[in-house]
Amino acid sequence: MLNFKTENTKYSLEEYTRYSKHLVLPQIQLEGQERLKEAKVLFIGAGGLGSPGIIYLAAAGIGSIGIIDDDIIDLSNLQRQILYRCNDIGYSKVEIAKKKILDLNPQCIVTVFKTRLSYENSIDIIRQYDIIIDGSDNFDTRYLLNDTCLELNKIHIYGAIFQFEGQVSVFNYQGGPVYRDFYSETENKESARDTCSNSGVLGLLPGIVGTLQATEAVKIVLGYKSILSGTILTYNSLTSSFNKFKIINTKFVLSTKKHWNKYYGSKSSTFVREISVIQLQKFLISRNPQYILIDVRNHEEYHKSHLIHSLNLPLQKIKGMNYSHINLQDKICFVYCSLDSRSIFASKFLIAQKLNIVRVRGGLNAWKNIIGDLDWTL
């Protein structure tokens, strides 16, 4: 539990009125609201995920908010980045975000960093805050954020979105798992290309995921015990479904700061073997009979398009399946989904069932982008 010194926290009559709906909640009351006022939260990115979190935490009474982003507002942002309006186009995201916060809650202390998070500035910026909310969309930033939070013992609230799906988790919380436990491989070209800018995203989705991140931040500040630590919460907007998956804590540690660089752009250890789509194509063409392709997307996605001769085992049903009739024991099982998230969960579960699993990095999207034809037998 974060230790806030609230003995000298003062509230004006205006603040009592502003937070009156919080003050009557038994789980918050004045003590909880004082904790919110003393809390310091940093947003990595002021885009789709950051927008709802920034405005809701400012409204909730978080006393100090930091925002780091070097981007300029563009017309294409307005479909999902709800902080901004047409007349904001061309201006700095962090400057406009600061103005919107102060328009809503003048008591909030807002600090903006018009830059990218980097190895050179991450320690100095992140050490000033209690909770770090990740709204980034690239692996370099996520790994740097992971390692800095680990070094400084800061709480890291992760969020990610892709097309119609989102993920949320809390990392480095009271000795719990960190981001590298969930996604230990370094950035690869196939996965890195699949972001909102080139693969698309439902405009409503970052609002849902970003608000869930903000909710976890409030719960942590208030000292609630039920936190998304050790668990990934996934949301599928097409099926209106939520799922939770456990994360194994590998006790990943960085021995010293000077060792950080070896983790950026280099391969770190992983519990799940992987293969690129190019390597997979070569294997399939070799006509090795001892394999099976497993597609863990839902039935609707599978019927729209899939790799020829693949078996559909939807992730949401995979835990309750009996695999004896499929004869997977003596085969190499290549697991894929649209991109990466579901295949990671499925692979870890199937490995626990003593199956020979190899995950396909980048999934069906990478195959379409790099190989093209889904009928690899041609």
From Swiss-Prot:
Signal peptide boundaries: none
Binding site for ATP: 48, 69, 76-80, 93, 137-138
GO biological process, one term: Mo-molybdopterin cofactor biosynthetic process
Residue stretches in coiled coil: none
Localization per record: Plastid, Chloroplast
SMART domains xref list: RHOD
Catalytic reaction equation(s): [molybdopterin-synthase sulfur-carrier protein]-C-terminal Gly-Gly + ATP + H(+) = [molybdopterin-synthase sulfur-carrier protein]-C-terminal Gly-Gly-AMP + diphosphate
Superkingdom classification of source: Eukaryota
A cellular component term, taken from the record's GO annotations: cytosol
Pathway(s) annotated for this protein in UniProt: Cofactor biosynthesis; molybdopterin biosynthesis
GO MF annotation: an example: ubiquitin-like modifier activating enzyme activity
Domain Rhodanese span(s) in chain numbering: 287-376
InterPro entries, A to Z: Rhodanese-like_dom (IPR001763), Rhodanese-like_dom_sf (IPR036873), ThiF/MoeB/HesA (IPR045886), ThiF_NAD_FAD-bd (IPR000594), Ubiquitin-activating_enz (IPR035985)
SUPFAM superfamilies named in the record: Activating enzymes of the ubiquitin-like proteins (SSF69572)
Alphabetical UniProt keywords: ATP-binding, Chloroplast, Molybdenum cofactor biosynthesis, Nucleotide-binding, Nucleotidyltransferase, Plastid, Transferase
EC annotation from Swiss-Prot or TrEMBL: 2.7.7.80
Family of this protein: Belongs to the HesA/MoeB/ThiF family.
Functional summary from the UniProt entry: Catalyzes the adenylation by ATP of the carboxyl group of the C-terminal glycine of sulfur carrier protein moaD.
Protein name: Probable molybdopterin-synthase adenylyltransferase
Record organism: Pyropia yezoensis
Lineage: Eukaryota, Rhodophyta, Bangiophyceae, Bangiales, Bangiaceae
